[in-house]
């Protein structure tokens, strides 16, 4: 199930996230296995605590209003921290699945918050025959499993997103190839 929640974040919240994070973008791209562009891990950047709290408030609302009812997690859960990503024109996120287990924790939902309106840059789920248009403030929630492989199309303008994963609290997975 792929959920689209238009205008979940307000124009003001989106602007606060974008303006808060941009000064912390690295000068050069730090290699990641499936994404072009530049990233900032908000939750691991002490100077971004205000942005981290703002995003946490949005994710708490998402958890309470949507995720708890749609995904019905079996255990206490929370998110895994927040990653901001900037794609320059023509850059993409390559086809991949997010994976159910990462860094020893069990994921059950992927969350993407679009921070810009774009022509192009659609989030594509080929197996589900679904494309999601980037619209500032829209949240997309989907399973991290192999059933929901995805990629993005290139955009003609800068595209900005924020990502997190909902994970089970206190449940550690060991002995699994990651």
Feature names for model-found ranges:
Residues 84-86, 101-119, 166:
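Short, conserved beta-strand element in jelly-roll/cupin
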Residues 9, 21, 99, 115, ...:
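Short beta-strand segments enriched in hydrophobic/aromatic residues
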Residues 1-76:
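Non-heme Fe(II)/2-oxoglutarate
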Residues 9, 76-79, 103-107, 134, ...:
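A generic fold-level signal
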Residues 19, 67-104:
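Non-heme Fe(II) oxygenase catalytic core, chiefly the N-lobe of the double-stranded beta-helix
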């Amino acid at each position: 199930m792929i959920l689209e929640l238009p205008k979940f974040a307000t124009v003001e919240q989106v602007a606060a996230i974008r303006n808060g994070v941009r000064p912390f973008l690295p000068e050069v791209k730090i290699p990641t296995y499936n994404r072009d562009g530049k990233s900032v891990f908000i939750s691991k950047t002490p100077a971004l605590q205000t942005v981290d709290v703002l995003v946490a408030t949005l994710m708490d609302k998402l958890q309470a209003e949507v995720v708890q009812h749609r995904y019905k997690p079996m255990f206490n859960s929370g998110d895994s921290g927040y990653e901001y990503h900037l794609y320059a024109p023509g850059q993409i996120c390559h086809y991949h699945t997010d994976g159910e287990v990462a860094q020893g924790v069990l994921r059950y939902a992927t969350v993407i918050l679009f921070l810009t309106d774009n022509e192009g840059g659609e989030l594509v789920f080929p197996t589900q025959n679904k494309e999601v248009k980037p619209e500032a403030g829209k949240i997309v929630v989907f399973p991290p499993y192999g059933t929901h492989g995805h990629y993005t199309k290139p955009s003609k303008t800068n595209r900005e997103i924020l990502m997190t994963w909902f994970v089970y609290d206190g449940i550690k997975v060991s002995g699994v190839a990651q």
